[in-house]
């Protein structure tokens, strides 16, 4: 996140009743939160932390979610997967008004009259338009069990990242992002100097799956049509999007498998023209 561009965007949109800024943590690494919180207070906007891929992340030694944001959202499955056994999320906030509102909207804004006075719980009302965001007991049980393993998952991903960094540094056509001690590596993102998609196809032929985290919003059809934003409007996002590639990283990977991925990346990079 370019902090200067972030503040410029807020200034440019002040007249549009700007209420909040959503800050996405990419790959499990916190941005410059001190500056972000400062900007939020300066312009009187809420700071919402999108920590879907950052469960367990720390910032200056403190757990994210208990710092200066107005709201933080976590996923109980921080490593993105369409095949996850359980999908659920958690919203944390120290703002009672936001918490009450979230509790209402998570179940179609339905309120019941059941209370300590004995009113029956089949008497209900709908206060607003909500959605079905509450989770099943099975999902909750699985999520709680997985949450207990968070620290061990993080430790293993950091071990895998260390192998990638050691094996892939100084490899031609490959750029490794700067190492950060508090990075929890829900994604391990590298940059390919050119023709990223062909590189990914070559890896796939070797049995190595990769991912693209992420395609900039303004390039997606819905947002492109709705807001008519020029492709070049966000040069940082565009330049990174054209080069980035995510290598496999999850706690179940063995060192042998990680080294196999490295072998294929190195071999393809050496043959890259």
Language model regions located:
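PLP-dependent aminotransferase class I/II
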Residues: 4-12, 16, 20-24, 29, ...
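A short helix->loop->beta-strand "cap" motif at the edges of active sites that frequently abuts
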Residues: 42-45, 80
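Proline-centered loop/turn at the N-terminus of a beta-strand
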Residues: 19-20, 44-46, 63, 70-71, ...
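Hydrophobic residues in well-ordered beta-strands that form the structural core
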Residues: 47-49, 93, 212
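Hydrophobic alpha-helical membrane context
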Residues: 37, 61-62, 89, 149
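Glycine-rich, highly charged phosphate/nucleotide-binding loops
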Residues: 1
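Active-site PLP attachment segment
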Residues: 67-111, 137
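Conserved active-site segment immediately N-terminal to the catalytic lysine
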Residues: 49, 53-85, 122-127
């Amino acid at each position: 996140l370019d902090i200067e561009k972030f503040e410029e965007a807020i200034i440019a949109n002040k007249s549009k009743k700007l209420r909040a800024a959503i800050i996405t943590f990419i790959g499990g690494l916190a941005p410059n939160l001190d500056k972000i919180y400062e900007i939020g207070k300066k312009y009187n906007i809420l700071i919402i932390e999108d920590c879907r891929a950052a469960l367990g992340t720390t910032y200056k030694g403190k757990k994210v979610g208990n710092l200066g944001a107005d709201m933080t959202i976590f996923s109980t499955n921080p490593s993105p997967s369409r095949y996850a056994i359980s999908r659920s999320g958690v919203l944390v906030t120290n703002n009672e008004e936001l918490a009450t509102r979230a509790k209402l909207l998570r179940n179609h804004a339905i309120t019941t009259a059941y209370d300590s006075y004995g009113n029956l719980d089949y008497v209900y009302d709908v206060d607003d338009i909500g959605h079905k965001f509450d989770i099943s007991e099975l999902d909750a049980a699985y999520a709680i069990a997985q949450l207990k393993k968070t620290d061990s998952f993080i430790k293993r991903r950091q071990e895998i990242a260390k192998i990638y960094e050691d094996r892939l540094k100084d490899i031609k056509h490959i750029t490794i992002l700067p190492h950060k001690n508090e990075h929890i590596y829900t994604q391990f993102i590298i940059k390919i100097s050119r023709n990223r998609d062909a590189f990914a196809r070559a890896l796939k032929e070797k049995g190595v799956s990769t991912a693209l985290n992420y395609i900039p919003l303004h390039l997606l059809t819905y947002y492109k049509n709705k807001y008519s934003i020029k492709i070049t409007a966000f040069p940082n996002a565009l330049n990174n999007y054209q080069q980035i590639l995510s290598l496999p990283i999850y706690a179940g990977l063995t060192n042998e498998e990680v080294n196999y991925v490295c072998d294929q990346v190195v071999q393809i990079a050496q043959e890259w023209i």
